[in-house]
From Swiss-Prot:
It comes from the Bacteria. This is Uncharacterized protein Rv0028A. Residues 24-47 are annotated as: Disordered.
Length: 47
């Protein structure tokens, strides 16, 4: 019984996501281009 209720909720979320993509497109805002890790916080990999 719980599985069917969970499946119903999942189907509803998927339907809402499909509708939102139809209305706004796959990326409603441009992804940021200036995100990069801090060079001091990363290790340089040596091969």
């Amino acid at each position: 019984m719980a599985d069917s209720a969970l499946q119903q909720q999942l189907d509803e979320v998927r339907a809402l996501l499909t509708r939102a993509r139809e209305l706004f497109g796959p990326n409603p805002i441009e992804p940021p281009t200036d995100i990069a890790p801090d060079p001091d916080s990363t290790k340089t990999w040596l091969i």
